[in-house]
Amino acid sequence: MATTAMRMIISIIFISTYVTHITLCQNITEEFYQSTCSAVSRGYLSALRTGWYTSVVTIELSKIQKNVCNSTDSNVKLIKQELERYNNAVVELQSLMQNEPASSSRAKRGIPELIHYKRNSTKKFYGLMGKKRKRRFLGFLLGIGSAIASGVAVSKVLHLEGEVNKIKNALLSTNKAVVSLSNGVSVLTSKVLDLKNYIDKELLPKVNNHDCKISNIATVIEFQQKNNRLLEIAREFSVNAGITTPLSTYMLTNSELLSLINDMPITNDQKKLMSSNVQIVRQQSYSIMSVVKEEVMAYVVQLPIYGVIDTPCWKLHTSPLCTTDNKEGSNICLTRTDRGWYCDNAGSVSFFPQAETCKVQSNRVFCDTMNSLTLPTDVNLCNTDIFNAKYDCKIMTSKTDISSSVITSIGAIVSCYGKTKCTASNKNRGIIKTFSNGCDYVSNRGVDTVSVGNTLYYVNKLEGKALYIKGEPIINYYDPLVFPSDEFDASIAQVNAKINQSLAFIRRSDELLHSVDVGKSTTNVVITTIIIVIVVVILMLIAVGLLFYSKTRSTPIMLGKDQLSGINNLSFSK
């Protein structure tokens, strides 16, 4: 019997395991633009979350007497231990929902408090293993983000008097029903585990019989399996402060999740998309602890609604583009900062700057519009003409030429500068390419790894077509003397404006220097002219004086006849 039971357990585990088949992306094309050191990967289809679908999940609980058959039978002991774990799990869930005023104040403190709490809640979960813990508030955080706003709203309504009974009564004769809550919202409710009827009508009667013996170990195993789900749900809510993501198979099994997807008010194409990508759906879903009362545990499951599907998506990869002609330490660099996922959406483009928030399955891109920016379609011009006049492309600048590599969908961008050695290798042939200084690209065809210095990068092995678009690196158009550095959130227009300001300042400085030089030259000319005039005047005076003097010395004294006669007469008169 034990062997049969073990086979049953193995078969259940096998059936409930979700196996994903990894397929190669088809029709992926990649364009590398040498002028901007960027690459665009195309050929993807969208699956954009635009809304949430909330559903209430219930588990029927049972109030168990503490004194259950004091037999020494081994099977009964196992049952009693399992019942003790069950009781502790229920107590854990009840303590989770206590102290609501504290929850409201804690919700105001928000996500940092939640993160701090989760770090301190990863210790071994003793409460479900038979050791009673001190009562503490584990958290039912309200309003920690718009992502779970709709689920939290439904959870708050379930705390109102009569709401749980309304759900409980609706599920008396069925495992699934639509219930209209007091806030006017209709939600699909489902009962995934009925521990109450099983414990009250099947388990306890067997334990409390006249001889307190259980001859069949299968009874113990069956209860352990049913109880294990409750224990795991309690553990998840406990260590995650009442809100968990992704959605585990304990919260909803695959069959339950597929059934819920089928009941969602969406198109058949959307249902098909979600059903074929269950693991992605789980990653983007939440479960929110609600209430434990009236022998019912209720929690909200919040699933994504992909309102935009099958529109084209592309991913932009960027790497630093630097000059290579200048001396070490004097180079300038420019990097496009608009990297991320882009998807067409109703005449515009949804941009997801944090690419890691999007999940890729084959050639399907699952993104949350809550993490997106809406841009005009002209943003595509940045790939082919970064200096276009219709859209101001985003860049950052620096004067630090750091070598690095960016792995793309079907290749790698390599920014290699200075004395760094950069190579591409094949696992069988070794180094097949050595990169020179600058920005370059290599496809994954025949390439397994890219090495930049001491860092090794493994390229993706997806199939696709790569196109190398050559062009003059735009960084060469800029003058290092006026290039602005450390602009982390700028655009082409802003950088050009700063360059123009610098050039205008230089021109103004030159003009001022020129005007000063001209003034000095004029003054010097005047002074020189005056000096020359003075010297000329002096020279002229000297020349006139010398001329007069020389004429005076060279002219003989002429005596008149009277003077001569008088002299003669005088001489004769003696």
Swiss-Prot record:
Residues 551-574 are cytoplasmic. Glycans are attached at N27, N70, N120, N500. Pfam families: Fusion_gly. Residues 1-25 form the signal peptide. The record marks R109, G110, R136, F137 as: Cleavage. Belongs to the paramyxoviruses fusion glycoprotein family. This is Fusion glycoprotein F0. The gene is F.
